[in-house]
Design a protein with these regions (language model features):
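Catalytic cores of nucleotide-sugar-dependent glycosyltransferases that transfer UDP/GDP/TDP-activated
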Residues: 1-173
Length: 173
């Protein structure tokens, strides 16, 4: 069982769960499949945390021909409280099982949590700095060349989020 009677990423002793890679895959696909079952056509999906970081990969590769998601934009929030350690080395094979293109997976030859974010950023349309982040994340974002919102220090973040979201939403005349 991936989630029952568990903490988010590690046990009470701080040891990472060995199946975090599978949990992330299950979580990302579960979100998308739930959206499909509810017959929603989202304009925007906002991804938070490492566990959802594979959602952009699945949305843009596995579900890329689904008309329900053809105009969906993805924003990812980056936090500096990322996990140390690695995912299961077999994560690439698990993703290939879903016919995810190898070109999007090569970075996972080194299956770190930072590299999960690299994949997420490369396939996202925007990013929000949800906290003061590490310099290597800033470099990742510069390479991705996507819009950025830095809102971790502003108390009026609701308006900033809404204004940022507006950049990605379709014009409704």
């Amino acid at each position: 069982d991936y989630f029952k009677n568990r903490l988010v990423e590690c046990d009470k002793k701080g040891k990472l769960y060995k199946d975090n890679d599978e949990r992330s895959i299950f979580f990302a696909k579960g979100i998308i499949e739930t959206i499909k079952k509810l017959n929603w056509t989202p304009d925007l999906i906002h991804v938070h945390g490492w566990i959802a970081s594979l959602l952009p990969l699945y949305l843009k590769n596995f579900y890329n021909n689904d008309p329900m998601f053809e105009n969906t934009k993805v924003i990812v929030s980056i936090y500096d409280n990322q996990l140390k350690g690695k995912l299961d080395k077999k994560i690439m094979n698990k993703l290939k099982f879903d016919d995810i293109d190898d070109k999007n997976l090569s970075i996972l030859e080194n299956p770190t949590y930072d590299n999960l974010y690299r994949i997420s950023l490369a396939l996202s349309d925007g990013v929000i700095f949800a906290s003061d982040i590490k310099k290597n994340y800033i470099e990742m974002i510069k390479k991705a060349k996507i819009p950025v919102l830095e809102c971790f220090s502003n108390i009026d973040f609701e308006k900033e989020y809404l204004d940022f979201y507006e950049k990605f939403l379709p014009n409704e005349n």
